[in-house]
């Protein structure tokens, strides 16, 4: 089975690229989806997050207040590392399970949609690495306008990830997403042909 890593900095359009690949029939293993699942009410990771960051990160319905957690976890490298130490081992375990299941089911290509693929050195375990690239100012603009995040928060999150240059060095294929959605779709036709 061909393992393809898909990554890009926050706001790069990586999820849009994953959706385009999924619509072409590729299996997507989504690290963000797994990250959401492991912190659902009743999951051990949620209790550990409450212990680490306080009960105020829980909504009245018992679910995780993601913005509340982000406000505490992305204040500095130490707090980000604490968040990662709780969530990343569980994400890795579930990811490995899904890859094994895909291979057992005869899947030919599995794409791992992982924001921190290069940050965590997981690019080395992939057969091919796709990096979605967008300049920082465009990423900030998109996240402020489309997700309603504050500019300061966005820049903190960007700064908590590896620099774009490091991510680009790990790329086998760079997907330029500085243009429109139509431009991205045109770029993706070439990428899909390579896969």
UniProtKB/Swiss-Prot annotation:
Enzymatic reactions: 3'-dephospho-CoA + ATP = ADP + CoA + H(+)
Question: Which keywords does the record carry?
Answer: ATP-binding, Coenzyme A biosynthesis, Cytoplasm, Kinase, Nucleotide-binding, Plasmid, Transferase
What are the residue boundaries of the DPCK domain, all occurrences included? 3-195
Q: Which Gene Ontology CC terms are recorded?
A: cytoplasm
Q: Which PROSITE patterns match?
A: DPCK (PS51219)
Q: Name one GO molecular function term.
A: ATP binding
Pathway stated in the Swiss-Prot or TrEMBL entry:
Cofactor biosynthesis; coenzyme A biosynthesis; CoA from (R)-pantothenate: step 5/5
* GO biological process terms on file: coenzyme A biosynthetic process
EC number from the UniProt entry: 2.7.1.24
The subcellular localization recorded is: Cytoplasm
Q: Which InterPro entries match?
A: Depp_CoAkinase, P-loop_NTPase
Question: Main localisation, per the record?
Answer: cytoplasm
Which residues participate in ATP binding? 11-16
Q: Which HAMAP family match?
A: Dephospho_CoA_kinase
NCBIfam families found in the cross-reference section = dephospho-CoA kinase (TIGR00152), PRK03333.1 (NF002879)
Q: What does this protein do?
A: Catalyzes the phosphorylation of the 3'-hydroxyl group of dephosphocoenzyme A to form coenzyme A.
What is stated as this protein's family in its record?
Belongs to the CoaE family.
The protein's name in its UniProt record: Dephospho-CoA kinase
The organism is Corynebacterium glutamicum (Brevibacterium saccharolyticum)
Tell me the classification of the organism that encodes this protein: Bacteria, Bacillati, Actinomycetota, Actinomycetes, Mycobacteriales
């Amino acid at each position: 089975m061909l393992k393809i890593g898909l990554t890009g900095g926050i706001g790069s359009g990586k999820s849009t690229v994953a959706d385009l690949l999924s619509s072409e029939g590729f299996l997507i293993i989504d690290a963000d989806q797994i990250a959401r699942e492991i912190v659902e009410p009743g999951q051990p990771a949620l209790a550990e997050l409450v212990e680490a960051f306080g009960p105020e990160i829980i909504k009245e319905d018992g679910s995780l207040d993601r913005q509340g957690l982000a406000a505490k976890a992305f204040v500095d490298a130490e707090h980000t590392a604490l968040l990662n130490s709780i969530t990343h081992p569980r994400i890795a375990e579930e990811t490995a399970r899904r890859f094994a299941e895909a291979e057992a089911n005869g899947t030919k290509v599995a794409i791992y949609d992982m924001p921190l693929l290069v940050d965590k050195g997981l690019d080395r375990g992939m057969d091919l690495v796709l990096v979605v690239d967008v300049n920082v100012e465009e990423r900030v603009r998109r996240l402020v306008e489309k997700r309603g995040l504050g500019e300061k928060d966005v820049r903190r999150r960007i700064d908590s990830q590896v620099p774009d240059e490091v991510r680009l060095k790990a790329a086998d294929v760079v997907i330029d997403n500085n243009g429109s959605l139509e431009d991205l779709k045109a770029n993706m036709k070439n990428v899909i042909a390579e896969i």
